[in-house]
């Protein structure tokens, strides 16, 4: 397939044609087969047929989004109080949330237990240790969440608080300690404490 545009230009005139690539893959699946609807399905539906609507949203709003990102970044880049190495680090370290190891669910898609009012969020500790949301490591990357998406960070903290009094098929109920993690790449959100050494 291909895409073609037709425009008529005057001499020395230029035009910018925006392009958007979108896809609608509404379900994320853990290694054991548990499936979760992705968070964006709260806004675009769960059919898997909404890539056009997603692209349309982007085409209608990309200029505003770009401007808001520029404003946000310029507030840091142009601030002489921050050394250059810190500016670089602040933006480069955001990659971790967007490289494929992040879950933000919006409901169970395969019959597992789920609280429909709780959209859980978590990310891998790293690709060498496939644990989600490890309590002893997550604080290293929690600053972007606290500063940029405080409601997401609050949800993560709430999940740890809930783990003190509840279990997910992983340990005796109500043991009064915080879970170490929210599952592995195979059991994310369904079996906490994939690292079985001890609770935190």
Question: At which residue positions do the language-model features occur?
Answer:
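Solvent-exposed loop and edge beta-strand segments that line ligand/cofactor-binding
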Residues: 121-137, 186-199
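Charge-dense, low-complexity intrinsically disordered segments
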Residues: 52, 147, 194
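Acidic/polar, glycine-enriched structural segments that form the non-catalytic walls/loops
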Residues: 1-135, 151-154, 161-168
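Helix-terminus loop motifs that line ligand-binding clefts
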Residues: 151-200
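Well-ordered alpha-helical segments within folded domains of soluble proteins
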Residues: 132-145, 150-157, 198-200
């Amino acid at each position: 397939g291909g895409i073609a545009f037709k425009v008529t230009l005057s001499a020395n005139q230029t035009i910018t044609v925006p392009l958007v690539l979108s896809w609608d893959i509404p379900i994320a699946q853990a290694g054991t087969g548990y499936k979760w609807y992705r968070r964006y399905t709260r806004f675009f539906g769960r059919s898997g047929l909404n890539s056009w609507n997603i692209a349309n949203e982007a085409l209608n709003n990309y200029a505003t989004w770009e401007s808001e990102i520029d404003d946000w970044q310029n507030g840091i880049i142009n601030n002489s109080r921050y050394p250059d190495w810190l500016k670089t680090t602040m933006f480069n370290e955001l990659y971790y949330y967007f490289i494929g190891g992040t879950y933000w669910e919006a409901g169970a898609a395969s019959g597992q237990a789920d609280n429909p009012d709780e959209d859980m969020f978590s990310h891998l500790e790293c690709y060498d240790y496939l644990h989600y949301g490890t309590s002893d490591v997550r604080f290293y990357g929690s600053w972007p969440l606290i500063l940029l998406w405080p409601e997401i960070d609050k949800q993560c903290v709430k999940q740890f608080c809930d783990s003190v009094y509840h279990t997910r098929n992983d340990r005796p109920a109500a043991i009064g300690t915080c879970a170490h993690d929210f599952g592995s790449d195979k059991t994310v959100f369904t079996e906490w404490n994939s690292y079985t050494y001890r609770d935190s």
